[in-house]
Amino acid sequence: MQLPISQYNELLQKKLEKLTALLHPFNAPDIQVFDSPTSHYRMRAEFRIWHEQDDFYHIMFDQATLQRYRVDEFPIASMLINRMMQTLLPLLKQQEVLHKKLFQIDYLSTLSNKIIVSLLYHKTLTEEWESAAKNLKDLLEKQDFDVQIIGRASKQKICFEQDYVDEVLPVNGRNYVYRQVENSFTQPNATVNCKMLEWAIDCTQNSEGDLLELYCGNGNFSIALAQNFRKVLATEIAKPSVAAAQFNIAENKVDNLQIIRMSAEEFTQAMNGVRAFNRLKGIDLKSYECNTIFVDPPRAGLDPDTVKLVQNYDRILYISCNPHTLCDNLVELSKTHRIEKAALFDQFPYTDHMESGLWLIRK
């Protein structure tokens, strides 16, 4: 697989032109552009495994033709993932219990040089598999991999030490530690993620009052932004993400950030006094003066009720993975807020995907 590296700048310029045109009706200022490394930028990858007689290998599917193709190296993924791909398969081939009915391998790597390898099977994992997988882990560690091996099958998950890795992200000269849990969302392009955090910190400099973040994941943004606010309140519904966020808060010595496990809808009910929640015992919502809100919605954008909720705040930091639904939301948001800053983050080079950020201020 070869990347069109020589065309990178031209492709990024086309994205900028598209985003500029989409934001033009909303009087957006000039868009800041944050580029990506041109190869080995993706920190996670998933591959199906294709078995052919006595051989097997990584495959992917062409999105246009749906035809499978063999993948022996993957320049999109981190150098660590590529090294693991080439080391792992020969070791798996030595043990039938490790490769029989293996149908997928997921890799999650970090800038801190740690990696999780998840092996997915169409069979029950036995003690024989466990013994072989432990031996596999030992062999990889002897080749200088800091690796966690996880086995997955129907209603089964086996891990030997832990199901997470601790990433270290350099942001504005400071290292932030982020626990990343296997099979949970993490930002795929670590270098661009660092640039997103630096941009968000820059936008919110000299902020007054408190910050609310909806669906904070492992605390990626709220931990870095806490330095700019008196207090930060963040919501998240996934238990593993909440646990990782709590670890990250402690590890980064952030003392003004509170995570609560509830949906945006539940939080709105609690904030408006519509109903009480046991999960909020010991948390005085009235003590928060949140006049800034951070949202990073899925591709569908914000639903109409959340748009109304967001409009109650003086300042909105909006990270979008879909500029079209962002513009749908801006039809309403632009009635109450103006765009102060706009950014394009090239999370996914060589694709049409555009990650963008807006800093909106009440008119």
From Swiss-Prot:
One of its GO terms (biological process) is tRNA methylation. Keywords: Methyltransferase, S-adenosyl-L-methionine, Transferase, tRNA processing. It catalyses: uridine(54) in tRNA + S-adenosyl-L-methionine = 5-methyluridine(54) in tRNA + S-adenosyl-L-homocysteine + H(+); uridine(341) in tmRNA + S-adenosyl-L-methionine = 5-methyluridine(341) in tmRNA + S-adenosyl-L-homocysteine + H(+). The active site is at residues 321, 355. GO terms for molecular function: rRNA binding; tRNA (uracil(54)-C5)-methyltransferase activity, S-adenosyl methionine-dependent; tRNA binding. The keyword Protein biosynthesis does not apply. S-adenosyl-L-methionine binds at residues 187, 215, 220, 236, 296. InterPro entries: MeTrfase_TrmA_AS, MeTrfase_TrmA_CS, SAM-dependent_MTases_sf, TrmA_MeTrfase, U5_MeTrfase_fam. It is an enzyme of class 2 (transferase). One of its GO terms (cellular component) is cytosol. NCBIfam families: trmA_only (TIGR02143). Belongs to the class I-like SAM-binding methyltransferase superfamily. RNA M5U methyltransferase family. TrmA subfamily. This is tRNA/tmRNA (uracil-C(5))-methyltransferase. It comes from Haemophilus influenzae (strain ATCC 51907 / DSM 11121 / KW20 / Rd).
